[in-house]
Amino acid sequence: MDDTYNKLPDEIWLEIINFSNEKNLLFTNKSFFELFDFMKVEEDIIECIIKYNLLHILAYIISLGGPESFIIKKNIITTESLNRHFKMSCEKGQYTIVTYLVALGADFRIDNDYGLIHAAKNGHIGVVKYLVSKGVNIGANDNCAIKFASENGHLEVVEYLVSKGADINANNNYPIEMASKNGHLKVVEYLVSLGVDIRANDDYVVGLAYYYDHHEVVDYLVSQGAVLNKSKYSSSYNAFILLPVEIWIKIVNHTQEIGLLLTNRSFFELLSLINIKVDIIEYISNNNLTDVLKYLVFLKSINHPFCRFIRYSSLDDYLVKSCCEGDLSIIKDLILLGASERKAVMLACQNGHLEIIRYFVSQGFNIKCGSNCAVTIASENGHIEVVRYLISLGADINSGNNYAIKYASENGHLEVVKYLVDQGANIRANNDRAVRFASRKGHLEVVKYLVSKGANIRAKDDRAVTLASQNGHLEVVKYLVSQGTDIKAGDDYAVRWASRNGHLEVVKYLISQGANIKADDDYAVRWASLNGHLEVVKFLVNQNADIRAINNYAVRWAHKNKHFDVVEYLISQGAVINPT
């Protein structure tokens, strides 16, 4: 940029850029970078930086303080943008960009370690190593990382993941099965060297290799002891080329191995001539035949009679799987085939897949449908970026008697709880259910926050402390007591149910605070005995509980439930098992 432009005052630069809408002009000189603080930025800054390969700008933002810099704190660069581009960069193996985005605050564990799984899937060893060094879970999503790396033949990634503890037998030998299916001999050899059982599932590994014409893999597996049953696995090449149509129809009708036809579109029409007993959508899903799925979409678009074989219940099952994995391409195809669009959005909210939600919103989906279920589900599962996005579109967080904050509190999602409160959620709704259910689940920080915002811990006869006691959450109990809760409420419900459920430390604490263990005819010792909690029983006896209350109820029910150690102890203390 020449001196003429450099000498322009800031206000002229702002006018030029706001008029031209060319925000990337600011990236051309670090001295102009601060102008972002004075502008209304609508573009995705990270997208612009990556598009023009301005990695030095990312480095500069990091030097400004990374997550603490004004450009992050003022939401000029959003968390959603950082996370979205982090995932895409992991998929593409853009190592430097990945490290910079993490330094700026991207969540490297977002969506159940999406970054690691897709870096491994695409063979990006540098990104994989970096993410592992940051502490991702290599076993996330049922060891998807090693499964996908094996499936796609990325030996170096497979070796590295194994060195870090990945399960080579994940999902019933999925890694070697998919490596064999796709002809990745080196990966197969490596997995065999580690002791994978190549004969598992009735020699399925060698059968797959044979079926897909990977003869080198077949020869190797046979040399290692695998047994190939050629009558069970027909070679796709020879069978399709040599057999006449009428024989193929007979074979498939007899074996119900519809995969023999699904591997080649030129034979797909034969399916309409076959008496299919196998669920075709389930088969496509289980075997990851996405190209066949797309062909089904085409057949449906022309009203092909074969579409009568599609079972809608199976479409929804496949939809659940795809939404969990965040695979938008498959989801689109399933919707076109008749799967529920609403279910797809709710599953995306449940699993935190913001891109999927954005897509359906762009297609006109009403995020307020079903009493604002979308924002409730996202809140329940702690997906803060999804919650923010839905609220920005007008989702009603108070719908359904404030279910959003109740479920977020119950599941311990403090960040979501705070955001919902900032947006006007009513923490007192439904008799202070939020604090009651946070107490029940033991989420101390959520309880403290709700109390700081005015939640009533004594609602519903001090239900918060009784639920915390019932479930053994000692620290929550202590905190609630410090805030003035009545541990004797409900005829000493707290100590009775803590005893009933075997929470010894809670029982001890409650008694130290004045709880009455003899309440309700010595309920505490009776039910501790009935449920076999010996240490609780001993402690209560030492505190003078009456073990003979209600006609020796304690020992009789301990005996009935076969808690013989409790029976022996109670008898030693004077209980009578068969009172006259």
Swiss-Prot record:
InterPro entries: Ankyrin_rpt, Ankyrin_rpt-contain_sf. It comes from the Viruses. The keyword Lipid metabolism does not apply. SUPFAM superfamilies: Ankyrin repeat (SSF48403). The keyword Repeat applies. ANK repeats lie at residues 81-110, 111-140, 141-170, 172-200, 202-230, 314-339, 340-369, 370-399, 400-429, 431-459, 461-489, 490-519, 521-549, 551-579. This is Putative ankyrin repeat protein L63.
